[in-house]
UniProtKB/Swiss-Prot annotation:
Residues annotated as binding heme: 442
Organism from which the protein derives: Bos taurus
Free-text function comment from the UniProt entry: Cytochromes P450 are a group of heme-thiolate monooxygenases. In liver microsomes, this enzyme is involved in an NADPH-dependent electron transport pathway. It oxidizes a variety of structurally unrelated compounds, including steroids, fatty acids, and xenobiotics.
Membrane topology: Peripheral membrane protein
Top-level taxon of the source organism: Eukaryota
Gene3D superfamilies assigned to the protein according to its UniProt record, in alphabetical order: Cytochrome P450 (1.10.630.10)
Entry-linked Pfam families: p450
Enzyme Commission no: 1.14.14.1
Subcellular locations according to the entry: Endoplasmic reticulum membrane; Microsome membrane
Gene name tied to this protein: CYP3A28
Protein name stated in the entry: Cytochrome P450 3A28
The UniProt record lists the keyword Iron: yes
GO BP, sorted A to Z: oxidative demethylation; steroid metabolic process
Amino acid sequence: MELIPSFSMETWVLLATSLVLLYIYGTYSYGLFKKLGIPGPRPVPYFGSTMAYHKGIPEFDNQCFKKYGKMWGFYEGRQPMLAITDPDIIKTVLVKECYSVFTNRRIFGPMGIMKYAISLAWDEQWKRIRTLLSPAFTSGKLKEMFPIIGQYGDMLVRNLRKEAEKGNPVNMKDMFGAYSMDVITGTAFGVNIDSLNNPHDPFVEHSKNLLRFRPFDPFILSIILFPFLNPVFEILNITLFPKSTVDFFTKSVKKIKESRLTDKQMNRVDLLQLMINSQNSKEIDNHKALSDIELVAQSTIFIFGGYETTSSTLSFIIYELTTHPHVQQKLQEEIDATFPNKAPPTYDALVQMEYLDMVVNETLRMFPIAGRLERVCKKDVEIHGVTIPKGTTVLVPLFVLHNNPELWPEPEEFRPERFSKNNKDSINPYVYLPFGTGPRNCLGMRFAIMNIKLALVRILQNFSFKPCKETQIPLKLYTQGLTQPEQPVILKVVPRGLGPQVEPDFL
């Protein structure tokens, strides 16, 4: 029996030619960084450096930083990726040349209607949407939404008290996840869920479905390996965002909008109502107002961008407070002095709390939820002697930046004092970027910080937190997607004192 098939010469030539063409297709972009004199790991045909992500993106970035220095080039599939850590180059990319060259984030795969979301929209569409949404996140509007969020802070306290009374260790991911879900759905859609006690509510189930992300899913790999298939996926209505979930939110927004217009509920202050008001404002030209599809996309992206980030950040903060009891005590002292006898928090007092701000900032330094900031280069450009070709994705590796011992002495240590008034002014603003910076920074930054601080004040007014045998020490991270604890943070919750158990009526 012959081991080699007896093909004709023409067949062998065709087969050999096909293999050569496939190899060229899978590697033709791989000489870019070598030509530019930029070091980096050797790519694997088709995959680039993607397979090296198996230990997590932060670990990959750290290894590259140690080996190649302040700048390196690599490939995700065939996409050129340039990592930068020099503050001056970061400033140029994120701020100085944002509008002219580095306006857009990378669109990774087919998005469907989500390409209209503020986080994903490009160029003029992004500018228009940002202009329309910015008024919803002013300090005045946040102050108006504060009572709504305050209700969910009270709900968080009640849920924690129930668990504390049982004497069992508490899964903080469940608690903070429910709080985050309730705040986001309450402010983005105006619905009141109590998701901890109603886990099968359609809003809860679809929101969690929206957040499921598997980096090595076959669909994700097909996007990396064969990006030319993206238009085909778009035509077939196959997107990274589950169709059933997007359809649910589309119908929900339509129904809520119709109900509010019918009942003339124009005085609500949630994000959805603010967007509806912008559609009907006489101050906005019709061609500039948000379309209904854009309205759905913004409401949905609020969940995608706000749920996991808030709940994980709260988990990290409470873990650090638990393992640093002197910091927890000092923060409780500031809270008690600012709001005596468990008084209801106020927006104005909350934003003035210095030590609370220090604790939140230091946690975001150690655990940046988005491990990277990305911008796509729109045209060939030279920055500080570095040539960046059109189409290159320029990224800022936040774990590297936030844990560089040259910038942060003993970066693995939790030290809120790094962000004290005396020290804060000495921090280069382009080496601490938990929410990005420049015109395309996170629009919801102040909203997220307000949610986090309000939750911390309410729970630390009422409880202290201690480690238990189920607490993972040291904490390990899951870093394949957004940064979060590998295992849920589980702690012992101890009610504080016998002072008034305030359940403020924010409304």
